[in-house]
């Protein structure tokens, strides 16, 4: 399945379908609709598609040189305490800067949670100076001797095809993108964070559709009432998240340079809660059959809980509450 996902991603890129509108440019909803569509088909594919399109948006926002035609990108920003990548300028190693004027560097260290690293042609990742300052962003071509993609450690069942493995860099050539802190401080950071909620919503919609189909086929009967109750709960949950995403997209397009952190936290937490409702209600209403006899349903039901763990759960609720306490509850009014 991992090879199939990589092939499908490349097909989307080659067909121009990964050239999504930039977030905050007036078509944010269209961007998120594309993410949701891919998510509804395959969440491992959505994970890689979202990373590729996020990397392109980041490099465009930070004024990076054009990407090679047909290239596929991973966006890797996880910073666990036991995995860090540091850089030194190439001219410190006796080499000149790149001809395109970018700051050429050498990367050393290990990067964790690199989704799609086995198939990506390039990576965009957070890196640090040897003195601990940063983070910076660096873009790196994967096909070079100084890049080693791990084949171990990824034991996931859900999201297995996203293959979020470790990558080890040993004097790998790369170029810095933007100044220190640019990745976290740019307005697009939270635009991208909100977009992940669209992927989750797409996956949840596919599971919900199975419940809808089963309920609609059975018609109105007392025996079907439990499915109808479940479908009502699922309908409310999905509509809640979809409405929040539409509202957030309009706001971001109207305020592209403003802080969208609270909006992003709301849509992510809403999408997570809605997906939890869908997972619970579809299982209770449909029983074991689709989990055991419908390969697409079974994979989606296995993938979605794993992808949702990209949420920070209660920590995000705390951040949202802190923000509301500081700015006020104006958005509660109609």
Model-found features: residue ranges?
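Short, charged, amphipathic alpha-helical segments
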Residues: 225-232, 258-266, 295-298
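Glycine-rich phosphate/cofactor-binding loops in nucleotide/flavin-utilizing enzymes
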Residues: 289-334
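Buried hydrophobic positions in well-ordered alpha/beta secondary-structure cores of metabolic enzymes
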Residues: 55, 107-109, 169, 204, ...
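C-terminal helix-coil-helix/basic helical segment that borders enzyme active sites and/or dimer interfaces
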Residues: 2, 7, 240-272, 280-292
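Glycine-rich flavin
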Residues: 2-119
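DPxDG-like acidic metal-binding loop motif
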Residues: 110-144
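Generic structural signal for well-ordered, non-transmembrane alpha-helical segments
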Residues: 202, 232-239, 265, 269-276, ...
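Glycine-rich beta->alpha junctions and the first turn(s) of the following alpha-helix
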Residues: 155-239
